[in-house]
Amino acid sequence: MIKKGIRIVNSKIVYYVFAALIFVTVFCLLGERGYLLWKDSPAYLAFDGRTGIVPIYPLFLQINRMIFGEELFLYAVIVEQTILTVICILAFTEFIRKRFRLSYLASYPVLLFSVFMPFTTNYPLSISNHDIMTEALAYPIFYLYMICFLKFIFDKKYKDLVIMVLVSVILALIRTQLQLVGVFNAAAFFYVSWMKGRKYPLGRQIMQAVLYVFLSAMVLLVGEIMILGANSAGQRLIAAMNKETEVKEMVMAEEGEPEAETMDEPETETNSIEQVEVQPETASVKVAETSGSNMTEQYGHLIIDKAVYEIDEDDYLLFEEEELQKLCMKIYQEADEERQRYVYARNDLWMWQDIMNGIGSGTSIIGAAWNEYLAENPDTGLTYSAINQIAVVLLKEHLGRVIYHTLRMLPQGFICTVFFQKEGVYLLCHLITLVIYVSAIVLAVWGYRRKDLNNQYPEFLLGCIVINICFVLIQSIMYFAMQRYLVYCFGIFYVAYYLTLKEVFNRFWHGRKKGRIKFGFWMVSQKKI
């Protein structure tokens, strides 16, 4: 009876029916039933090429607005996001199932891990496919990137590198922070080149390693050039579409017709938001005309935010010019009034939260301080660029503290990649995360040392470990380690962990038989995949 039940569950029809039920339940029934607007959503709806917002998602929203109209387009958006999410998850799980020759029974955990994270990060409030946020596209397309990434490191064919770089460019044009995927490309290239050259003597391998480092840097550089060029083209397209809309509105106004309503709602929503994630209150929202400018300018804003968090009362003495001293004092006063300075951070495991909130408030603090300074000094010769000058000086002065606070954000960043954070047992969350990562590294080393195990298992797991480490380090240093920035590889990591752990279980508890490993109905061929 039990064997018959297992055979039924192991059938193709049951597996895909189960997958359909999971997709409908998670992406249609859980969380917000309609669309959900977040604090940053108006910035994407505004369609004005502002700082830090790359073109794909605003274009995606605008095209839907043009096709379906103001009242329906957001509903069309969530339908399309849902379809894309399902397609990308299916593509990834099918790639894994076929690549590792899994039975349908063995594929259920792969499906479940892939579905639930990162898409349920904000549950019960929402599931990502219902959010009007870049993650609604970035999360599923990252699964497509991982297919390309894994195929490249598994097959070690340089032609796969081209497709991988192209998909990484698409990701970077959805969300600025995903430029870091170029680092994954470079790491994968180095790994493949190193593994292909292991047949040579050690001395030659070392010499080649230097060349591989240089070529990896070239891969990173080429990808970045492609990203900046594509972003520039996208911003010009946004500017052209905006200009066309303005011309139509002027013509309609001259003809005595009511003004077009297509842009009213997002403008109203944008004005009702005091601060969005990537747009300073005082910064221009003019479409960038130069290559990648609205991407590179974002790093300047983040430097300012970190500098504001570290400011001290006597830092105005670092400047000789009186006007700069006045502005610096205004910034300090505003930051101190808002209690968004390092001195107000808790000195415990939750310190990262205060650091993140403080850095995230930098834009609004700067805006308020600048406005107060202008009100008191209307004849000043300073321009807003003086803020950058102050920020650079503050960062140099407090560099050690900046590094320390960055390090304090790292532990929670690693927790976000593989586990959850609960206040009552937060120390336990740290310990569990440490155990997960240490055990994953042990499994990867074990996999490489086993001559009878296909290298795909440890390569998959090690790749996920490296990706998570890069996510945490780069996001913490360049941005700040918010959970939704770090969970891209959450479910994929556990897929790799599960596959490798299953092989450990097979070998230590069931042995071998005629070139095949027997684990009930979990049959996995040990021939070259």
Whereabouts are the PLM-identified features?
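Extracytoplasmic catalytic/substrate-binding loops of multi-pass membrane glycan-assembly enzymes
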Residues: 30-45, 49-64, 68-72, 383-384, ...
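Aromatic- and kink-enriched transmembrane "portal" helix at the membrane-lumen/periplasm boundary
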Residues: 55-58, 74, 78, 111-138, ...
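Loop-to-helix entry region of an early transmembrane alpha helix in multi-pass inner-membrane enzymes
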Residues: 59, 69-90, 108-111, 427-431
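Membrane-interface anchor segments at the N-terminal boundary of transmembrane helices
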Residues: 75-84, 376-377, 381-469
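Transmembrane-helix motifs of polytopic, lipid-linked glycan transferases
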Residues: 79-103, 141-148, 439-442
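Membrane-interface transmembrane helices that cradle and orient dolichyl/undecaprenyl
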Residues: 143-160
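Membrane-interface alpha helices of multi-pass inner-membrane proteins
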Residues: 161-175, 212, 216-220
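Membrane-proximal stem/loop segments at transmembrane-domain junctions that anchor or position
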Residues: 231-410
